[in-house]
Structure formats: structure tokens, C-alpha cells
């Protein structure tokens, strides 16, 4: 089977998911993707470029797989009639209805509606966790209340009926070659390996660390994770306060070095306010870190 995998947001967990699918699927995965350029622009502007990229795809496509950042109706109209009759599957890494907003920023319903239309256009929706699916289905009727005239709720059941849960695959074998190094630690090593962004709630993470430090508890830190977004000031303050106890600071490009860091950590922490299936936390657990995560 030839599967065209469309990813307008080729970064982080989206990137890991697609690369894992390419590597391990028994089907022929044909990826077209765009690099990270901001959520709003990708949801608005991705379809024109992606539709153009399909002209280079010569294979007969049996299934269309798109991510939740795709403007599916626009993509289908710009490529019509090529993909009109084949099954269309959308993988819901996240949704625009419940994703937290930065402080002082209101949710723009435009992107909820783009997400909503794309879900209606897909034949099957795959959510990354049961919590994610339930969280979205709870928020959808509240969104439909915003309609200024006739309010149609039948799409809620329609979307629910074509939704399933399938956890993203994890490529963990790449961590097996690394030897466990945590026995060499003089102090407990606490790991942060998620995005440096507000929805990961770094303020709470460092607030707890500061309290531990205030009562003279000693620990070392590995502060890794994706840093291409705007860096919260908490990380710079942490460098000033804990510099000599920070064994790594910043994104890790090299896979071997990343594996070495995870195999030297004792505890991995998430304080995220918005998370459905954190690949980074799973990787750290696989490498032997004890998880402290939200309920």
C-alpha cells in the first residue's frame, strides 16, 4: 500500500512519529512535509505548498495520512480530483480547542474551525490517547455554541463515531547501545527533556527546584529539550542559580549524546499543563529515569 503522509509541522513529536512510521511500517510511506514556521501560518498557508509538492509524487496513492496541523479541505480542493476517492486519515497529535494559550492571548476560534472542518473531511480520526479524545469531544459542543445562527450538534456524534485511539509508535532501540551511567552520579540528577515553552509549565518546575534548593537539598540538572521556540525566562534564571550543577543546557542534536544524558539521569519531571502522550518522557523512562508527572 502506498501511503502519502502529509506533515506541515515537521518538528518535535510530529517529526518523530513520521520518521518512525517510515522506518517500521510494512507499507510504502511517501512523506511530504514542511519545517516549523509557527502554528498559525502552517494551518493557513501549508496547503498551497503541500499541494504543489504532490506533483512530484508519481506513485498511485492508496491512503492519505495527514497530521492535525493540516488544512485538509484546502489541501483536497487544491489537489482535486487526485485524492478525492481514497481513504483520508487524520492523526490528532493535538487539537486547537483545548491547547492552552500564552498568558494574555485569547483563543482565536478561526483555528478551531479550520481543525473542525478538517476533522469532518477525514474518514478516520486517530487520537494519541483516550484522554485526548475525551478532552476534545467535551470541548467541541462548547465551541459549536459560538455559532451566531443555527447550531448543529450532529457532527459531535459523527466525529466521535469515526475516532479511535492509537498511541504513537516509539523508536526506542536506538537507546540500547548506551551503558547506564547513573551509578557514577554524586548527586541525584533531575532531567527536563521537553520543549522549552509555556505549556510545559517550566515556572512550576523551577519553583519546586528552588524550594528544594532553599532547604539545602543538593541535585544536578540536565536541561535538554527543544529550544527553537521562545525561551521562557525561567531557564536563564536557572542557569544563573544552578550553573555549576547543570551538566547539560540546551537542545541535543546528537542522538548518542542524548541517549548518554538520559542514561545518566535519575528522575525525569513533567509539569506540563497540556500533554497527551509525551514521547520525551517515555524515552527517559525507557533509559531508566524515574518519572514524576501530572495526574
Where are these regions (language model features)?
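Donor nucleotide-sugar binding/catalytic pocket of nucleotide-sugar-dependent glycosyltransferases
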Residues: 121-178
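Conserved donor-binding/catalytic core segment of Leloir-type glycosyltransferases
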Residues: 167-171, 181-213, 221-222
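Aromatic "clamp/platform" in nucleotide-sugar-dependent glycosyltransferases that forms part
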Residues: 273
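Nucleotide-activated donor-binding/catalytic signature segment of Leloir-type glycosyltransferases, i.e.
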Residues: 225, 233-256, 267
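Active-site proximal beta-strand in glycosyltransferases
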Residues: 64, 81-101, 115-120, 124-128, ...
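Short hydrophobic beta-strand element within catalytic cores of glycosyltransferases
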Residues: 290-294
